[in-house]
Amino acid sequence: MDIRLKLILAAVILFMVGLPVSGILRGTKPPPPDPDLAKIAEPLQNPQARSSSDSPQQITKEEMVFIPPGEFIQGTKQGGFNERPERIVNLKGYWISRYEVTNHHYLDFVEQTGHRKPGPPSRYAKRLAQLRSPNQPVAYVSWHDADAYCRWKGMRLPTEAEWEKAMRGIDGRLWPWGNSPRIFKANLGGSEDGYEATAPVGSFPLDRSPFGVYDGFGNMMEWVENWYEEQAVNLNESREANSADRGGYKTLRGAGYTSYGIDLRITARSFMVPDFRDETIGFRCATSKLDKNPNDSLL
């Protein structure tokens, strides 16, 4: 190849390589931002989720559901070692939150008490944008945060047995809707259910227990009051009985929006140290005070 041809070829290569560089140097207008980044848990088309036409400005009111006294089936024969055995448990009547505690209501608590704001370490702050709309369940709260909120409301966290009865009913079903593990009935792992992250509370009509309590199976795992007891048969519903010297872990119930697995059931149990905070963990409150309707004092 002669010198002249080489020079022409080199000039063509430099011209082609220089196009994108010159665009940057001249301040070429960048492409429009991905609209998905501006959306916060916007639902996809899914018949199991509520219509996206619901006003995002309408705040979901805190509401308590009364769970009547009596027996229910706790545990299961089909589950893991910490879910067995299946047994009959008798509870007194109590009230429990219909929905997981939302960002709106938790931030009211923060503003009025000066309590720590919910949120991840700064390196994960970008992720928080998907979790912060008013009607989404509050995330990044420790057991201590959840306990403080419920006490501020004049309530407490539910016990394991109270949580399970409220989410399951009394007939031993394995999911809030029955005994069929069908997909898209709750906000679990993946976006096929209609949400990339958490959904506004109560978005899945089928993730509703026989008592009318929402999101027990999906959306967020939830702190309960008990210290974790590996052998479920040894659970003592006297809330003072399970102490930190029995392992130092608090119990988590339910599944979350990142949970996968065909073996997920409403009876599943997990645990974590009480000062742990994560985007998959939230909570709800309960009370055994039966002298008045707690809904009368909720905003």
Predicted regions and their residues:
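Residues within well-ordered beta-strands of beta-sheet-rich folds
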Residues: 95-97, 224, 284-286
